[in-house]
Amino acid sequence: MNGTEGPNFYVPFSNKSGVVRSPFEYPQYYLAEPWQYSVLAAYMFLLILLGFPVNFLTLYVTIQHKKLRTPLNYILLNLAFANHFMVFGGFPVTMYSSMHGYFVFGQTGCYIEGFFATMGGEIALWSLVVLAIERYVVVCKPMSNFRFGENHAIMGVMMTWIMALACAAPPLFGWSRYIPEGMQCSCGVDYYTLKPEVNNESFVIYMFLVHFTIPLMIIFFCYGRLVCTVKEAAAQQQESATTQKAEKEVTRMVIIMVVAFLICWVPYASVAFYIFSNQGTDFGPIFMTVPAFFAKSSAIYNPVIYIVLNKQFRNCMITTICCGKNPFGDDETTSAATSKTEASSVSSSQVSPA
């Protein structure tokens, strides 16, 4: 084994030299230079600095503007709330630990931080799945005349929490465990060991299958069908110029959504699966640290892609920031244009970016 396993940790560093210490008690500067830990702390501070205002504005603007309180926006609010889980429940802990070079909050703190980080990430992921299903059902119309209503939105939000709990809660009750990962300043599910005492192998397989592979397949299927439907409608010239413009925006949004999802999560999932499948192989702490910390940036990507690129929401946000005035456009003009689009057979409420 090229790492050192303890009762509640796994350090990716051989202990032949006798320098490995518990990441809950001693600085881990034998894994990386002190300045590298400082870089991690600065990075986490940046995520907090950017993630809090964007996600807070998302919640605040929706409360301020009644026209934004639509069923679909319930899912978007859920997404912003999930990001707050990570920004408040995980990021400050990781930043403070990085400043000290080890996980200073002990094993209990590790479980709390790991739970919040996993919970927030999974709520966000399953929110994207609900959005994908909604777009597919409304635009592709596998069920004729289906209208996404408030009850559907509430059910969707409930599903995201149930699925997130089904992933984040088991390690708290003995199925797998949360341990420090990478440079030992943040916690996640144990991909490093089989740990038969907590049936770790079965949980990791369950997590990758149910909480990563299946959501990814659903997202790709729904948005793949969405793109095909939009292209077919444009080719048949069944829609007005305004609607075709909305369709192009959907195509652009779909590409951004899929690429952002891949950029945020696939590197982390791939490295985690590699480590799990090749236990005992030689890899450094940076190997897991970089994708793990990069995945945390989804707390910023998500609101930018799913909220800010929504024209109506963007106008409302600008109006709120500018104390009731929008210096860049006229809300009424935008609303009129939206109404015209909604009059077509494929309405903007059906095809505009969520």
UniProtKB/Swiss-Prot annotation:
* Glycosylated position list: N2, N15
| Residues with a covalently attached lipid (S-palmitoyl cysteine) | C322, C323
Q: What keywords sit in the KW lines?
A: Cell projection, Chromophore, Disulfide bond, G-protein coupled receptor, Glycoprotein, Lipoprotein, Membrane, Palmitate, Phosphoprotein, Photoreceptor protein, Receptor, Retinal protein, Sensory transduction, Transducer, Transmembrane, Transmembrane helix, Vision
The answer to whether keyword Glycoprotein applies is yes
Ranges of compositional bias, category Low complexity = 334-354
What the entry says about post-translational processing? Contains one covalently linked retinal chromophore. Upon light absorption, the covalently bound 11-cis-retinal is converted to all-trans-retinal. After hydrolysis of the Schiff base and release of the covalently bound all-trans-retinal, active rhodopsin is regenerated by binding of a fresh molecule of 11-cis-retinal.
Q: Which Pfam families does the record cross-reference, listed alphabetically?
A: 7tm_1, Rhodopsin_N
Q: Where is this site: Plays an important role in the conformation switch to the active conformation?
A: E113
Q: Where are the transmembrane segments?
A: 37-61, 74-96, 111-133, 153-173, 203-224, 253-274, 287-308
> Which SUPFAM superfamilies does the record cross-reference, listed alphabetically?
Family A G protein-coupled receptor-like
Residues found modified as N6-(retinylidene)lysine: K296
Q: How does it sit in the membrane?
A: Multi-pass membrane protein
Residues on the Extracellular side? Answer: 1-36, 97-110, 174-202, 275-286
Motif 'Ionic lock' involved in activated form stabilization — list its residue ranges.
Answer: 134-136
Annotated spans, Disordered: 332-354
Single Gene Ontology MF annotation: G protein-coupled photoreceptor activity
User: A GO biological process this protein is involved in?
Assistant: visual perception
Stored PANTHER family:
OPSIN
The entry's protein name is Rhodopsin
Organism whose genome encodes this protein: Ambystoma tigrinum (Eastern tiger salamander)
